[in-house]
Amino acid sequence: MFVKVGDKVRVISGKDKGKEGTIKQTLAKKNRVVVEGLNMIKKHQKPNNANPQGGILDVEAPMDVSNVMLIDPSTNEPTRVGFKTVDGKKVRVSKKSGESIDK
């Protein structure tokens, strides 16, 4: 997967198109990511010991990784991601600027 937890991304399709956020969680087996503050859904929570009131909560739902684009840290623009081997390590590289994303 070309994104990691903590990366800044821009949503390129769906109801939150054009919005930016940081990756909160990656679900590699399902090819999905959870972006902080985006793709919010209503969850009906039954009362329990942790939340005695219960009610309707807003939570972030996972979205497909193909719907997000990584933001290049050097240019603050969305970019595609490539991979290079540097000193025996696999490093993510921005396709637009050609600079390494992993520092």
From Swiss-Prot:
CDD domains with a match to the protein in the record: KOW_RPL26 (cd06089)
Keywords attached to this entry: Ribonucleoprotein, Ribosomal protein, RNA-binding, rRNA-binding
GO biological process, one term: translation
PROSITE patterns (UniProt xref): RIBOSOMAL_L24
Presence of keyword Cytoplasm: no
Molecular-function GO terms, alphabetical: rRNA binding; structural constituent of ribosome
Record GO cellular component, one term: ribosome
Pfam assignment, any one: KOW
Function of the molecule: One of two assembly initiator proteins, it binds directly to the 5'-end of the 23S rRNA, where it nucleates assembly of the 50S subunit.
PANTHER family: MITOCHONDRIAL RIBOSOMAL PROTEIN L24
Family named by the database record: Belongs to the universal ribosomal protein uL24 family.
Self-association and partners: Part of the 50S ribosomal subunit.
Official protein name in the record: Large ribosomal subunit protein uL24
Gene: rplX
